[in-house]
């Protein structure tokens, strides 16, 4: 009886020790994975390419209306970055757009969209040019950016990502000296288990695309001028 009791005790102890070792190994693996995925930030800056990809429409020639888009004015309080990732174990990683000028990014994104499939689902003759350099253009589009942000907060086993923007786009019509302005803002969120900078890039790109989609939905082009669609 004593021997059988001792054997049972030893067996139970072995099972407990094996279970504890498996739990410990799991914890160490999780810690290692979190550490390797960057739970501590060094303050570096990641530059994100956020121009939405375009699928051009099939047209013979662009519409015969000359459109110039000026780089948007950046009126954000902090122009050194568009946001940051707060790491689980302290520290941050900063985010910025490629070229570090959101105003140029937005102007180029709008130009790409109009060339591919703009108003009335047509391609338009459009280029980006410095302010005041194209006085004879039929339409000159400018803008002001008040918010252009991308942030991520790492938590245990997940990272919460937010993107947002707020801006005004103004189209000045040469034909009658009129203008049309639209104020736009939007935000998107996502939660991921394994974080990468592509997650922020995709969400920011989607935010830019959504803003441009709404601008084109709110406006139209008629008689060589941009007008409210309703």
Predicted regions located by residue number:
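Generic short beta-strand segments
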Residues: 71-75, 144-150, 185-187
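Bacterial N-terminal signal peptides that target proteins for export
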Residues: 15-27
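Short, Lys/Arg-enriched N-terminal segments with co-localized hydrophobic residues
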Residues: 1-16
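Bacterial N-terminal signal peptides
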Residues: 25-35
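A structural "domain/chain start" motif
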Residues: 38-109, 217-230
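Sec-exported extracytoplasmic/periplasmic mature domains
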Residues: 111-120, 212-221
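Surface-exposed short loop/turn segments
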Residues: 40-52, 122-179
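Short secondary-structure boundary motifs at beta->alpha junctions and helix caps
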Residues: 89-101, 172-220
């Amino acid at each position: 009886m004593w021997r059988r009791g001792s054997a049972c005790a030893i067996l139970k102890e072995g099972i407990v020790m094996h279970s504890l070792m498996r739990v410990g190994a799991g914890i160490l693996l999780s810690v290692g994975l979190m550490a390797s995925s960057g739970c501590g930030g060094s303050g570096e800056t990641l530059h994100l390419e956020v121009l939405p990809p375009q699928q051009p429409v099939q047209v013979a020639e662009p519409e015969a209306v000359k459109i110039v888009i000026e780089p948007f004015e950046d009126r954000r309080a902090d122009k050194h970055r568009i946001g940051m990732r707060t790491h689980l174990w302290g520290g941050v990683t900063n985010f910025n757009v490629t070229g570090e000028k959101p105003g140029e990014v937005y102007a180029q994104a709008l130009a790409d969209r109009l060339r591919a499939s703009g108003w009335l689902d047509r391609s338009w003759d459009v280029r980006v040019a410095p302010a005041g350099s194209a006085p004879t253009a039929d339409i000159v589009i400018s803008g002001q950016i008040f918010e252009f942000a991308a942030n991520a907060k790492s938590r245990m086993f997940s990272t919460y990502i937010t993107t947002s923007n707020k801006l005004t786009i103004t189209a000045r019509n040469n034909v009658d000296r009129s203008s049309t302005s639209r104020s736009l803002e939007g935000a998107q969120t996502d939660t991921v288990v394994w974080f990468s900078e592509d997650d922020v890039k995709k969400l920011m790109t989607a935010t830019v695309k959504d803003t441009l989609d709404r601008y084109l939905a709110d406006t139209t082009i008629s008689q060589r001028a941009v007008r409210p669609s309703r």
